[in-house]
């Protein structure tokens, strides 16, 4: 896989992961915790695909292959980092929503 194609796949998978994470957040806000957790699983799968590409590139560079770092790859890495952070934060927010829902159920008994 050439560097430009790898960067495009990184952007695509990272972008999908980020979108799925925010879909999960919106579901959690509606009290649909189970559905939100399923979306997070999908987001993790897209993140694994992106991370696999990144790892492959890092290994190639460690083996001595040289890459010309361009704006596209910087952009791709930015997408990856943002998607990872978004998913981690959304997971924590989902946990908070789940706890709040449980407390509300206890109060309304």
Q: What are these regions, as identified by a protein language model?
A:
Residues 1-109:
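Terminal alpha-helical segments
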